[in-house]
Amino acid sequence: MSASKATMLILFALFLSDILLVSIPRAEAQLIVPCKTSEQCKSIRCSNGSAQCVNKQCQCPSLKQIYSVTDVSCKTVSDCVASHQCPTGLSACIEGKCICLP
C-alpha cells in the first residue's frame, strides 16, 4: 500500500514540475493608455525618460522588445541556429518562425 502512495507522490511531483516549465511567460506586461499628443502622456511614469504618444498609445522609451521575429522558417531550433540570424544560442523556433531572444 505504501509503495503505491510513493509512486503516486512521485508521479504528482513530475506532473507539477512539467506544469511549471510550460508556464513560462513570453512577453512583458504593458499599460496601454490612448493618446492624441505626447502632452497627454505626462501622467505616465517611465523608469527611463518620459512617455511619448506613438501610434495613438503612450509608450515609455525604456520598454524594449522581448524578442525579434526573423523571416526564417523553422521546424526546430537547429534550423534557427543554422541560419545565423541571431547571436549564438539565443534563438528559438516558435510557430514555425525563428525568433532572436534578448
Swiss-Prot record:
Keyword Signal recorded: yes
Keyword Cytoplasm: no
Major location (coarse): secreted
Subcellular localization, as worded in the UniProt entry: Secreted
GO biological processes: defense response to fungus; killing of cells of another organism
One Gene Ontology cellular component annotation held by this UniProt entry: extracellular region
Cysteine-cysteine disulfides: C35-C53, C41-C58, C46-C60, C74-C93, C80-C98, C86-C100
Keywords in alphabetical order: Antimicrobial, Disulfide bond, Fungicide, Plant defense, Secreted, Signal
Signal peptide: 1-29
Coiled-coil segments on the chain, per record: none
Family classification: Belongs to the DEFL family.
Protein name in the entry: Putative defensin-like protein 298
Taxonomic lineage from the root: Eukaryota, Viridiplantae, Streptophyta, Embryophyta, Tracheophyta
